[in-house]
UniProtKB/Swiss-Prot annotation:
Subunit annotation: F-type ATPases have 2 components, F(1) - the catalytic core - and F(0) - the membrane proton channel. F(1) has five subunits: alpha(3), beta(3), gamma(1), delta(1), epsilon(1). F(0) has three main subunits: a(1), b(2) and c(10-14). The alpha and beta chains form an alternating ring which encloses part of the gamma chain. F(1) is attached to F(0) by a central stalk formed by the gamma and epsilon chains, while a peripheral stalk is formed by the delta and b chains.
Pfam families tied to this protein: OSCP
Recorded family membership: Belongs to the ATPase delta chain family.
GO cellular component, one term: proton-transporting ATP synthase complex
Identification of the protein by name: ATP synthase subunit delta
Entries under InterPro entries matching the protein: ATP_synth_OSCP/delta_N_sf, ATPase_OSCP/dsu
Membrane topology value: Peripheral membrane protein
Regions that span the bilayer: none
Length: 179
């Protein structure tokens, strides 16, 4: 995976630079890049893009035809570049890196919050407020439920994980007793 990230990084940075300078705004581009990544991740699309009977122009036309959103010329050019360099199927990795660049630019981060039970809106707001103080970033929460946690929450912000779940506490206790 590290190799794919390395190959995808220059494309993500170039796309981010173009999006940052576009009057449409980063949010519009983030949605567009996400849609392109979803299309590229589709197994049928991956198979079609690997068809040796299609030339680069046909691959570009087929792919752009599958995108429901209106594509600006810069996005069409980007798709053509990816097809020409045989990198179109890297779009999911490029999209992940694009979002990371966008978040860094905006001083925000994605907070993956996993709870043992459904959290109310008030609980999520309170948790996000505390986490924003801890991490020093504006956080965008994505909340999910995993009953295997037994209780508590697990929060991942970037590569940092804060796990206060009962499951994690029991695992630490088990490790301490086994030592």
């Amino acid at each position: 995976m590290a190799e794919l990230s390395t190959v995808a990084r220059p494309y993500a940075e170039a796309l981010f630079g173009a999006a940052r300078d576009d009057k449409a705004g980063l949010a519009v581009w983030a949605d567009l890049v996400s849609e392109m990544a979803q299309v590229a991740a589709n197994p049928d699309v991956r198979e079609a893009m690997a068809d040796p009977r299609l030339d680069d122009k046909q691959r570009s036309e087929v792919f752009t035809g599958l995108i429901k959103s209106q594509l600006p010329q810069a996005a069409r050019n980007f798709i053509e570049l990816l097809v020409k360099n045989d990198r179109l199927l890297l779009l999911p990795v490029i999209a992940t890196q694009f979002v990371a660049l966008k978040n860094r630019h905006e001083g925000t981060a994605q907070a993956e919050i996993t709870s043992a039970f459904e959290l109310s809106d008030a609980q999520v707001k309170e948790l996000i407020a505390a986490l924003e103080l801890k991490f020093g970033l504006k956080l965008k929460p994505h909340v999910s439920v995993d009953q295997e946690l037994i209780g508590g929450v697990r929060v991942a912000v970037g590569d940092q994980v804060l796990d206060t779940s009962v499951k994690a506490q029991l695992a630490r206790l088990r490790d301490t007793l086994a030592a």
